[in-house]
């Protein structure tokens, strides 16, 4: 089995079993062996799942991959909330999502950043606004 297929299998198994530790392990393997575009659909699903604690790692992976297919998931994830991140008044996860959108740098990604810049959370809105001048 190729590295790519092994990573896909690990991520699928982690998601099927809803095993948070397995998500962490699979992401570690993915980063070690190299992220590939074939991971994007699974990463998009996982970034929206609420049963694990690796959302920031997934945002970083999607930022590195810069795949336009991840735009919707990243924009939705930027507005999501997770109990384990309640301590973070700076919304670091949302910030990572806005960086990923900016790095994708398509018209659709910029449009989603504009939408986020109008959201009701002033911190997230500021992150999105800040990304626009850097990429537009």
Predicted regions and their residues:
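Buried hydrophobic core positions in alpha-solenoid tandem helical repeats
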Residues: 6-11, 39-44, 73-78, 111-115
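Amphipathic alpha-helical segments within extended alpha-helical solenoids and repeat-rich scaffolds
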Residues: 70-81, 122-123
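Structural detector for internal amphipathic alpha-helices that build alpha-solenoid repeat scaffolds
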Residues: 1, 12-35, 45-49, 55-68, ...
